[in-house]
């Protein structure tokens, strides 16, 4: 049984950056079966656990499920052009472990809010 897992990362809101000087990235994995998927954040290739919150349960959409994880950091870390943020979805498919990773960095960011 093959199913299509997709992973997307959403940028922080300008409001949060302006009002709280924090930036939250949201990673959404969808198209998988329950208990088959974990989400991990990496910053510059290093696993990050601080500031990470992952939903305890996946959400059902028809026959497949989705799961959301958030990574919160100081705004300056988000604006540092050298930083590379990555969400990795690890899951089982056809008896083997597979992974999909999505990266977001300054190329895809909005212009800095002055």
Regions found by a protein language model. Give the residues of each.
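Terminal anchoring/processing modules of extracellular glycoproteins
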Residues: 1-114
